């Protein structure tokens, strides 16, 4: 749709037409995003699988320089013992250490609603986001959805933060030096300076989820609970599996069982406080459903 909107000259929230630039590879696309952000242009990109891995070196730079952007990823598996192009979380989990926040959706409607949360939070906190959903299972699903009106989102955009971002753009009129080399005694200290930005992310995501919930009538939380209030067995999962899990939970609870599910939306930064608040106090057993194989680890990434 972005190509169509650009070709049609559709105007975005900022009164501009969107320029779509296709690069020679995903590595080139990530480099172009980095340069575009440094020049003060709000920029986003779309990728998946091995293509996302090619972007990792630039992702470290983008996150390290606190450049707000969103990478939309239809999460897909990575070729290992054989090629497979279908959905799992191997690609996005390879990016956990880059400094990108990670927001996950489980349905086409959730993608519509929460993508806005990723963009708004990135602008306010300066932390870049991976906004991901399951490849094929969600990315290629035909589903009737409710589309938010642009005018409903406009009041939520932190225009002061947009102005701040643009004021930091590289320009010959206000020359600055960025991206220099540092020795260990200063590098480690400067690397820690970003912590307050990441600490602020869960609260800001929660704020914008509440605003989107007001617009759509659909409730969103960092960790959404579904099931019996007095559940004794709970599964924790992320992505399209949550849709099937709801059906199973309804069926089992109707038969007298006490089960529930916690759907993870904000995976990074991970808020233990919000997770514990979502799990019923009656819970005795928890099962974590992962979609990534991490050989040699004590548990998979979500676990």
Tell me what each language-model feature is:
Residues 76-77, 133-140, 160, 239-241, ...:
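Glycine-rich beta-alpha junction loops
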Residues 2-5, 60-63, 119-121, 146-149, ...:
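Short, solvent-exposed amphipathic alpha-helical segments in soluble enzyme
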């Amino acid at each position: 749709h972005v190509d169509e909107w650009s070709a049609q000259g559709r105007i975005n929230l900022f009164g501009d037409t969107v320029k779509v630039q296709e690069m020679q590879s995903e590595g080139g696309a990530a480099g172009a995003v980095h340069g575009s952000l440094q020049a003060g242009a709000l920029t986003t990109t779309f990728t998946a699988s091995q293509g996302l891995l090619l972007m990792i070196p630039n992702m470290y730079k983008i996150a390290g320089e606190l450049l707000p952007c969103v990478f939309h990823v239809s999460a897909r598996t990575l070729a290992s013992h054989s090629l497979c192009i279908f959905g799992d979380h191997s690609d996005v989990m390879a990016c956990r250490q880059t400094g990108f926040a990670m927001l996950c959706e489980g349905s086409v409607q959730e993608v519509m609603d929460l993508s806005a949360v990723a963009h708004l939070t990135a602008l306010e906190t300066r932390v870049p986001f991976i906004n991901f959903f399951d490849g094929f299972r969600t990315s290629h699903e035909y589903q009737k959805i409710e589309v938010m009106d642009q005018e409903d989102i406009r009041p939520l955009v932190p225009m002061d933060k947009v102005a701040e971002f643009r004021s930091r753009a590289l320009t010959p009129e206000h020359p600055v030096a960025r991206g220099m080399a540092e020795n260990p005694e200063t590098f480690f200290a400067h690397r820690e300076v970003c912590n307050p930005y990441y600490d602020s992310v869960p609260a800001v995501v929660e704020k914008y989820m509440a605003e989107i919930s007001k617009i759509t009538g659909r409730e969103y939380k960092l960790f959404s609970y579904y099931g019996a209030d007095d559940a004794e067995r709970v599964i924790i999962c992320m992505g399209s599996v949550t849709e099937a899990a709801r059906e199973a939970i309804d069926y089992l609870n109707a038969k007298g069982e006490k089960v529930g599910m916690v759907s993870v939306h904000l995976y990074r930064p991970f808020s233990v406080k919000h997770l514990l608040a979502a799990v019923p106090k009656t819970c005795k057993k928890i099962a974590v459903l992962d979609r990534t194989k991490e050989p040699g680890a004590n548990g998979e990434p979500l676990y």
